[in-house]
From Swiss-Prot:
Keywords: Ribonucleoprotein, Ribosomal protein
Subunit structure, interactors included: Homodimer. Part of the ribosomal stalk of the 50S ribosomal subunit. Forms a multimeric L10(L12)X complex, where L10 forms an elongated spine to which 2 to 4 L12 dimers bind in a sequential fashion. Binds GTP-bound translation factors.
Species per Swiss-Prot/TrEMBL record: Francisella tularensis subsp. tularensis (strain SCHU S4 / Schu 4)
Example of a GO MF term: structural constituent of ribosome
PANTHER family, per database record: 39S RIBOSOMAL PROTEIN L12, LARGE RIBOSOMAL SUBUNIT PROTEIN BL12M
Protein name per the record: Large ribosomal subunit protein bL12
Record flagged with keyword Ribonucleoprotein: yes
InterPro entries associated with the record: Ribosomal_bL12, Ribosomal_bL12_C, Ribosomal_bL12_C/ClpS-like, Ribosomal_bL12_oligo, Ribosomal_bL12_oligo_N_sf
Function: Forms part of the ribosomal stalk which helps the ribosome interact with GTP-bound translation factors. Is thus essential for accurate translation.
Amino acid sequence: MAITKEDILNAVAEMSVMDVCDLVKMMEDKFGVSAAAAVAVAAGPVAGPAEAAEEKTEFDVVLVDAGSNKIAAIKAVRGATGLGLKEAKDAVEGTPFTVKEAASKEEAEVLKKQLEEAGAKVELK
């Protein structure tokens, strides 16, 4: 029995946002495509002065301050980056630290929310 599109859709629906982001990256690498490019093509060209005010699509998630609960911030950084305990601790203590570079808007917002829930101050650049 072959896996159907519906089976794949159901499996993705049960995944966390971070797992879905990882899956998208893996698919981009495997097939040599970019999900951001497909969205831009599907949206079509924008006419007039709106072209000059093009919305930023990639963001750097920067940890500005760990806040009062450094342990929670370290756990959040480890979860977001996959760093080891010592590396995450050094990153949190050596702020500002770029947690993720060139993240999509959605992924950047998710990371920002996770870090802020841990008590950290975060900027999207």
